[in-house]
Amino acid sequence: MGLPSINIEFYKKAVSFVARSSRGVVLLLLKDSTKTTVINAYTEIEDVVKEDWTADNFRIIDLCFMGHPNKVIVVRAVTKEMGINVDECKQLIENLKFDWFAAPCLSKEEGALFASYFDSQKKKKYKKGKAVLVDQAADSPAVVNFATTNISIVYKGEVITIKPEDYTARIAGLLAGVNIRESSTYKVLKEIVDIKQSKNPDEDIEAGKLIIIFDGEKFKIARGVTSLVT
């Protein structure tokens, strides 16, 4: 009667593997001078001390954890007078291990620099990290081009509007929570109550844009695509 128990053990291990594979690591780059600790690692939102972050940044971290990643590494960006110091921020994250990256604090120009960075990391160093950025048609498997705007969500019982840049943290957390048996396509985003809907979802998807759609009942990821189109 030992064989069934062996099968059960294999099953348990398989379930454990799927659970582990579904829990990737997200790196969030945030502009925040509330505290001085640069690199902060959390395994659940309860680990985060609210007073260590601005209210907006705490909400961004909270949104990320909605996707159930294994860990969220929050890095305080090195700033300069007119934004962040991209080169120094890249040095900060260079040796950190993560699967998904989001940086709501980036300008479009800074986002383009990070898109180029992640693309080159993928090509030259074969690193697996991918970036979720807004309005970055990078044509790269290492960059997700998030392209939905006017996002309204229910958060802590209130309806609020979220900038697409801030919502990249939610998308990164969701992507980190997709296991090897699943796809991010049609993943439901239960907190959303309104968006600016795409006029032509098929064209947007073909153009390498990750968008949110409304199917008449639920808001969900249209298709889990990167910005790669060639």
Regions found by a protein language model. Give the residues of each.
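A glycine- and small-residue-enriched flexible loop/hinge signal that marks low-structured segments
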Residues: 88-230
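Small-residue-rich
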Residues: 1-152
